[in-house]
Amino acid sequence: MSNWLDKIMPSKIRSESRQRTGVPEGLWKKCPKCGAFLYKPELEKNLDVCPKCNHHLRVSARRRLDIFLDKDGREELAAHLEPSDRLKFKDSKRYKDRLAAAQKSTGEKDALIAMRGTTMGVPLVACAFEFNFLGGSMGQVVGEKFVQAANVALEHRIPLVCFSASGGARMQEAILSLMQMAKTAAVLEKLKQEGIPYISVMTDPVFGGVSASLAMLGDLNIAEPYALIGFAGPRVIEQTVREKLPEGFQRSEFLLEHGAIDMILHRHQMRERIAHLLAKFTAQEKPGTEAPIEFEVTEKPDVDEPEGQ
């Protein structure tokens, strides 16, 4: 999108200015917390954690599973499932059009990806929410994918891990969406009865029907640092109760302090700690340890001045 400067500056000057920087576009990303400009290849190497302030940036579902699972032996589950507009829902835009736009922008069919694989050699089933797909909202396909993933875990008696990032139930699917809360809770009860471990990992943000169902039903409830977790958002609560909320209210650190979650794990530790926990839960040999991530942080270069000045 062009800004006011683009409108008043001749295109020739704009192009020459870009050429003088010598920095290709799209190589830098701004940290939403500290405002530092981060070199994308280094940011990816650091698992999308800001090396300046330690802020955990949001990542896509596939990126999340790529970080967490071993490279070999992955199998995507229920990849054929696609959402449909059974209620012919329309608000300011048709639901059918919203789905098409979300599928085009994310490359995913819906807001959940499920895979069977291993992490540090420990077999498991892992799910991850795609927040960029309609806010990671839970509709019929998300609920069905989660249930099928849990059933694979039941069939093979291997643990289930879910990374949540969601605004809640999908309003465009109305009662069909709300039913997924009961549906996912029911299959998790089956896992519990069979003694199959389920670990819930909450990432920024987790709200609504997802936080009120599968996200808070883990045998172990883990969160990333500074993740926003709750049922209604803080602004909605403040407008309702007409009071200022405590500092850090609904952040993972606040929830840990008040006993709502079991632990907070840094993204660098997530894979190793969960693998060790699952190995202990399932009486398997303890996995090894991974080398720490190390690199020198590159500072964003200044705009090169033209020669002769």
UniProtKB/Swiss-Prot annotation:
Q: Which reaction does it catalyse?
A: N(6)-carboxybiotinyl-L-lysyl-[protein] + acetyl-CoA = N(6)-biotinyl-L-lysyl-[protein] + malonyl-CoA
- BP-aspect Gene Ontology terms: fatty acid biosynthetic process; malonyl-CoA biosynthetic process
Q: In which pathway does it act?
A: Lipid metabolism; malonyl-CoA biosynthesis; malonyl-CoA from acetyl-CoA: step 1/1
Can you name one GO molecular function term for this protein? ATP binding
What EC designation does it have? Answer: 2.1.3.15
Q: Where in the cell is it found?
A: Cytoplasm
Task: Give the similarity note.
Answer: Belongs to the AccD/PCCB family.
Protein's UniProt name = Acetyl-coenzyme A carboxylase carboxyl transferase subunit beta
Q: Which organism is it from?
A: Marinobacter nauticus (strain ATCC 700491 / DSM 11845 / VT8)
Gene behind this protein: accD
